[in-house]
């Protein structure tokens, strides 16, 4: 939810350009708890909004309405910045520089080009940095406070994941069979009832195990009746909307209907589906290693040489990898298991370790590898493909639920903070505490 990462450079430039102009004695526009909103803040942001609206061809409300909206935005920023100070939240220079580099990249600029752009618009780089720092602070406060108010139950994730899994996209192809119980052009109620009763009976028979094709041949008025009602493959978006709506959440083997249309009652069977399941398969590795950590008692060269000697002994058959690991490995988590790391995604490992591991063949032992932990001797025991479709679907469902609840809760939280704060707007005769 780091919205500050997507700031438009022009907005920040315009918002601060006004500060560079000569100012008369600045006025306090509002008192916000222990802070203030200055008139120059409002004027600067007002100019920014107008300029950006003009550049994008958008309409803006009248100045009075716009000023009110801007003032409310600045009041909320002020409240959150004061909260950040009380909570001890700070933005390091390193994090700030990374954020600015990201903004430059998003605007297809180098940092040097950004600095030049800022200077051309009359804004110092230091002023720009502080504006971004404020954006990051308010975002951090909001994220911290709102996150703790969000509860997502496992049942919610399961339900949404199942719903998403059953959702059929317009590009999904379905293999359908169809039975049509016809109605005359202007049917009487008795005819409608009789046709509906027959359709319901057929559905019950099919669900009870009766052969769909045989019932289609015997009862359907559809042109494909003699083929057992088989319609073949087709995309959902190509079907009549009456069918598509009911098939939106269908799954393989499902009987859908009866569906009433102008010509009769329809019964559909989903024989098969393709293009709906996007299986997510990941590679997992089973590896083991021996770790030596350089220290005052063991240099890098000594650690490397010791592992080379160990590898030679293992390859010659004099000893096993597990035995050496138990004797010399300095990884307490795996040494007593003979260096076994178990099945895991290679992405969890240190990049240098991972890269060396993924170059190995099954059973192969690496040369000594240096990582941020020390020196490793690595053996790839085995690899496997694991279906992570269900896990990925649940992760996506969780993110969707979180984002939905965050958006709702953030608005509620901001309204609560605004109501709880002491705010006095100083606007001539309209000055009043809120």
Swiss-Prot record:
Record-linked Pfam families: Rotamase (PF00639), Rotamase_3 (PF13616), SurA_N (PF09312)
Q: Which residues form the PpiC domain?
A: 171-272, 282-382
Q: Which InterPro entries match?
A: OMP_Chaperone_SurA, PPIase_dom_sf, PPIase_PpiC, PPIase_SurA, SurA_N, Trigger_fact/SurA_dom_sf
Q: Where in the cell does this protein reside?
A: Periplasm
GO molecular function: any one? peptide binding
Entry remark concerning the domains of this protein: The PPIase activity resides only in the second parvulin domain. The N-terminal region and the C-terminal tail are necessary and sufficient for the chaperone activity of SurA. The PPIase activity is dispensable for SurA to function as a chaperone. The N-terminal region and the C-terminal tail are also required for porin recognition.
The name this protein carries in UniProt is Chaperone SurA
Please report the organism this UniProt entry assigns to the protein: Yersinia pestis
Q: Gene name on record?
A: surA
